[in-house]
Amino acid sequence: MFKSKKEITVEEFMRELERDPDFARRKAVREEELARREAESRKEQATLLRALAAVGVNVSTVWDLVNTSASYTVALPILLDHLNRPYSDGIREGIARALAVRATRPIGWSVLVEQFEKTEPSNTRVKDGLAVALAEASDDSVLGELIDLAKEKRHGDSRVLLLSGIKRSRRPEAKEAIRELAADPALSKEIHSWKRGSRRPK
């Protein structure tokens, strides 16, 4: 079957777009805006990045820590110190998510809880980042506190992200909490999805 003259490939279509002056101008504006935002973000993070570099953690953005499998325990005290500083939401979220490791619990659990309690649900990015950090940093020694946070409806939909920390525990109170939280409209969908995922075809 032959391709008609009106049919073009994606590559051909993109080449035609590149030749369109309006498209090229819009693309240049988008790229310029992206470069500007990246430069502003690097400038805003400069103090944090210098502090990290001083302990041997060399990254171009705090989000590099979120996306690495390498250990950076030495950086945790610095991240905790900067978590409460007046950064933009995107950077604060990155700091919070970088603290989402088990080694944070012994040195920074109270800081994470305090920041989670203080952050309004309307600040979704930071609130979610802190919830992820709490869930990943938690262990059985703070299980009761994690459950209490998940039950507090004033914390909004970010509570869904706390559930993985509760689910990970094998303690009876964790299972009881999950059963109770399954009745919460904001959490029930996530909890019921676990049950569906655990079913095996016969």
Give residue spans per PLM region.
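Generic low-complexity, intrinsically disordered sequence content enriched
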Residues: E12, E18-P21, F116, I147-A150, ...
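Structural detector for internal amphipathic alpha-helices that build alpha-solenoid repeat scaffolds
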Residues: R25-R37, R50-Y72, D81-R85, G90-T104, ...
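Amphipathic alpha-helical scaffolding segments comprising HEAT/armadillo-like alpha-solenoid repeats
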Residues: A39-A51, Y72-R85, T104-K118, D139-K151, ...
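Intrinsically disordered, serine/threonine- and proline-rich low-complexity regions
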Residues: M1-V55
